[in-house]
Curated annotation (Swiss-Prot):
Gene of this entry: rsmH
Location in or out of the cell: Cytoplasm
NCBIfam families for this protein: 16S rRNA (cytosine(1402)-N(4))-methyltransferase RsmH (TIGR00006)
GO CC term (a single one): cytoplasm
PANTHER family reported in the protein's UniProt record: 12S RRNA N4-METHYLCYTIDINE METHYLTRANSFERASE, S-ADENOSYL-METHYLTRANSFERASE MRAW
UniProt EC number: 2.1.1.199
Top enzyme category: transferase
Name of the protein this chain belongs to: Ribosomal RNA small subunit methyltransferase H
GO molecular function term, any single one: rRNA (cytosine-N4-)-methyltransferase activity
Alphabetical list of HAMAP family matching this protein: 16SrRNA_methyltr_H (MF_01007)
Main location per the UniProt record: cytoplasm
Catalyzed chemical reaction(s): cytidine(1402) in 16S rRNA + S-adenosyl-L-methionine = N(4)-methylcytidine(1402) in 16S rRNA + S-adenosyl-L-homocysteine + H(+)
Family indicated by similarity: Belongs to the methyltransferase superfamily. RsmH family.
């Protein structure tokens, strides 16, 4: 299958980077190369782009899409490791970094990846297929209490306790091997009247995907390391697709903008923690009505941007 992915908030994200033609930029989630291509259009031959992705299919697709550009470095890795990646490339500071945290259309549409609750496929959900932990491992090996906490915390699923119990009961008969089997278990666990609010498996699949790929743990560290690697006035632009991610970005940006831990009664700061960034987006930028109509997957997207000071 061809790697297809419509870049969300494309114009807004590129504008937010305030691109310098000779600058160095990092696309932490290369995907099909949509954002990267627009960055490269604004760079001179002296500028440089580092494209990172943990999915080899994404890197292959991006190389084809960006084949006319010679100032691209492709890195098969997780952006959690951005600090060591730049270290290995002997790059100290960069002028801008973007993260698009959404699952690509390709990953959702290719049934064999196991991300979609709309298509029956083996339980997988690994962004990086070289990793050992898959959705199969989570569903069939995690204890009931662990499953409950994952569904509750990562999926904000109100029926997390019941779904976890139903999963454990079903797997005692036979291992749960496909997304279709999991969807049926979820349907049986959620009362019919609550299944009118979108697909009943949506929150559970989100939660399992986040657990498999350690998405939230990765994000906190990646934001800190990215800010440390920015030049003065460099920008960090992050697109999120659900409230858990957005909350992490919002809170981390606030911590980095106002890190002082002194009591409010202190007349001056004595903790020595200096502000590292200025938040550009007091409220997140959301897709236009037109974009939401054209690309339904953009509806929940939010863009937050900060500037290194």
């Amino acid at each position: 299958m061809e790697f297809k992915h419509i870049s969300v908030l494309l114009e807004e994200t590129i504008d937010s980077l305030n691109i310098k033609e000779d600058g160095v930029y990092v696309d932490c989630t290369l995907g099909g190369g949509g954002h990267s291509k627009e960055i490269l259009k604004k760079l001179s031959h002296k500028g440089k782009l580092i494209g990172i992705d943990q999915d080899t299919s994404a890197i292959k697709a991006a190389k084809e899409r960006l084949k006319d550009y010679e100032n691209v470095i492709y890195v098969h890795n997780n952006f959690y490791n951005i600090d060591s990646i730049l270290e290995e490339l002997d790059i100290d500071k960069v002028d801008g970094i973007i993260m698009d945290l959404g699952v690509s259309s390709y990953q959702l549409d290719e049934a064999s990846r196991g991300f979609s609750y709309m298509k029956d496929a083996p339980l997988d959900m690994r962004m990086n297929r070289e990793e050992n932990l898959s959705a199969y491992g989570v569903i069939n090996n995690y204890k009931e209490e662990e499953l409950f906490k994952i569904l509750k915390n990562y999926g904000e699923e109100k029926f997390s306790r019941k779904i976890a119990r139903f999963i454990v009961e079903k797997r005692t008969e036979n291992p749960i091997e496909t997304t279709g089997e999991l969807v049926e278990i979820i349907r049986k666990a959620i009362p019919a009247k609550f299944q009118r609010e979108g697909h009943p498996a949506k929150r559970t699949f989100q939660a399992i995907r986040i657990e498999v790929n350690k998405e939230l743990q990765i994000l906190n560290k990646a934001i800190e390391d990215s800010v440390n690697r920015l030049n003065k006035d460099g920008r960090l632009s992050i697109i999120t697709f659900h409230s858990l991610e957005d909350r992490i970005v919002k809170v981390k940006f606030k911590e980095l903008e106002k890190p002082c831990t002194c009591p409010p009664s202190f007349p001056i700061c004595v903790c020595g923690k200096e502000p590292q960034i200025k938040i550009i987006t007091k409220k997140p930028i959301e897709p236009s009505k037109e974009e939401k109509e054209i690309n339904s997957r953009s509806r929940s997207a939010k863009l937050r941007v900060c500037r290194k000071i």
